[in-house]
C-alpha cells in the first residue's frame, strides 16, 4: 500500500478517539455513519460533475481535486466501519487478470 494511504489510515484511526471540535474527521465520526455516507454521496456527485466539465473543457484540475475528496471520504467511511484501505487494495489485486464480465458473473446474488 502506498505510504500516503498508510499514513492517512493511521490518522483516521487516531481521529476516532479525538474530540469532535479537534478536527474535521473527528467531527464526522461524532456525527455518525449517516453523515459520513451523506458526504460520500455529495463528493460522488461533485466528482461526476467535475468529470463532465473536464470532458468538455480538457481541464482536469477540478476532477483530480473532487476525486481526492471522494477517495478521502470513502476512506473515512471504511474506517468508521472498521475496515482498512488495504482490504480494498487486496480486492483490486484479486481482480487483476480476471475479466470484468467473469468477475460480475461470479458474484453471489444479493438477497
UniProtKB/Swiss-Prot annotation:
CDD domains: NTP-PPase_HisIE_like. One of its GO terms (molecular function) is phosphoribosyl-ATP diphosphatase activity. Its main location: cytoplasm. GO terms for biological process: L-histidine biosynthetic process. It is found in: Cytoplasm. Keywords: Amino-acid biosynthesis, ATP-binding, Cytoplasm, Histidine biosynthesis, Hydrolase, Nucleotide-binding. Its EC number is 3.6.1.31. Pathway: Amino-acid biosynthesis; L-histidine biosynthesis; L-histidine from 5-phospho-alpha-D-ribose 1-diphosphate: step 2/9. InterPro entries: HisE (IPR008179), PRib-ATP_PPHydrolase-like (IPR021130). It catalyses: 1-(5-phospho-beta-D-ribosyl)-ATP + H2O = 1-(5-phospho-beta-D-ribosyl)-5'-AMP + diphosphate + H(+). The keyword Hydrolase applies. The keyword Nucleotide-binding applies. GO terms for cellular component: cytoplasm. Pfam families: PRA-PH (PF01503). It is an enzyme of class 3 (hydrolase). Belongs to the PRA-PH family. NCBIfam families: histidine_hisI, PRK00400.1-3. This is Phosphoribosyl-ATP pyrophosphatase. It comes from Pseudomonas aeruginosa (strain UCBPP-PA14). The gene is hisE.
Amino acid at each position: 500500500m502506498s505510504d500516503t494511504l498508510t499514513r492517512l489510515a493511521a490518522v483516521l484511526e487516531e481521529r476516532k478517539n479525538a474530540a469532535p471540535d479537534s478536527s474535521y474527521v473527528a467531527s464526522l465520526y461524532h456525527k455518525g455513519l449517516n453523515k459520513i455516507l451523506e458526504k460520500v454521496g455529495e463528493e460522488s456527485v461533485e466528482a461526476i460533475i467535475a468529470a463532465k466539465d473536464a470532458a468538455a473543457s480538457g481541464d482536469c484540475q477540478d476532477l483530480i481535486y473532487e476525486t481526492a475528496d471522494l477517495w478521502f471520504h470513502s476512506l473515512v467511511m471504511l474506517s468508521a466501519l472498521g475496515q482498512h484501505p488495504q482490504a480494498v487494495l487486496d480486492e483490486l489485486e484479486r481482480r487483476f487478470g480476471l475479466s470484468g464480465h467473469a468477475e460480475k458473473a461470479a458474484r453471489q446474488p444479493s438477497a
